[in-house]
Amino acid sequence: MPKLEQFEIKKYWQIFSGLKPVENKVSHDQVLPILYNSKLDSSILNKIWFLADIDDDDNLDFEEFVICMRLIFDMVNKNIDSVPDELPEWLVPGSKAKLIKERQKAKQQENAEIPRQEVPDVDWYISPEDKTYYEKILSTCGPMADGTVTFAELSLALKSKFFNIGVSDMERTWKLINPRDLPSIDRDPAMYFIHCLRQRNDIGTSIPSELPPALAEVCNKQRVEYDLSSKQADLKRLDTKEPTKNDVTKLGDELDRLEHSLENLTTGSTSSTLQGTIKMSKESLNQFKGLLAFMENDLNHPNPDSNANVKYVTDDLDNIDQQVQMLETYLQQKRQELGSLKAEVGST
């Protein structure tokens, strides 16, 4: 922004005099035609007027008028991209310097008195009601052949429901939920994708940079492919022994113990919310049992011509063992919740 030249000041004086100032001042109404002729947005003109009216009397003396005209011409001629928040020192008249400092001090005090609003964090708990709502959204997405959903399908479904989020919010959340950068994600990560963006839209939560450990395991979970011709079936595990019937029996015992714990927890529970989450856990357990039966059949009827079949079962055994451990941890948490609920009921 070039500094004021003498010819500019003369030009501004001619304009100022033509407005017929009263007591060496012009009002906002007198300057209004000049403001409108600039074709600048009203928000820009208001900011220029605020900066120029240093003594805040809704009138401009000649020194203030010079400031107003210079900022308008700089914006019109694109010498500056935006109106500055504060006047540059070379544009501040010497007679107004004290007023400028007082205005800046008052502004700082005003900002200090305004309490800062903390941005809330994402609450990753999905209630049964939330789950039902997210399932309805997912039902509108066109799933892939393997049941997964793409970013394009999810973002298209959410654009018509969440109006306070942009593409950048969706992309950041997608990278968070999909750390392996897969072309599509499973149903569970997709629900957390919707859950995070819903809170961003409704209450302005910040999108975190990383997931909680338990949720990270869900989003990083290796997909189980049942197609023996897939690439996953060809993976080599040099440090893994071939599975035996003892391995399957051991896994079956763990599943039986887990099912027994779930039944005990269900019998003693007094919370409808807890009942809902236990039902979800039972559904997962039934899926594991079905997969166990599938693997037992593979072991009882092996295909001698396919080494991929053996490696496939080995991979799945390791995968299910990890998920059983996660469910046991989950059960322990629910037992603690049940104990708290019983204590509350006993104290009433």
Curated annotation (Swiss-Prot):
Superkingdom of this protein's organism: Eukaryota
Keyword presence, Cytoplasm: yes
Matching SUPFAM superfamilies: EF-hand (SSF47473)
KW Calcium (keyword) present: yes
Function according to Swiss-Prot or TrEMBL: Component of the PAN1 actin cytoskeleton-regulatory complex required for the internalization of endosomes during actin-coupled endocytosis. The complex links the site of endocytosis to the cell membrane-associated actin cytoskeleton. Mediates uptake of external molecules and vacuolar degradation of plasma membrane proteins. Plays a role in the proper organization of the cell membrane-associated actin cytoskeleton and promotes its destabilization.
Subunit description: Component of the PAN1 actin cytoskeleton-regulatory complex.
Protein's recorded name: Actin cytoskeleton-regulatory complex protein END3
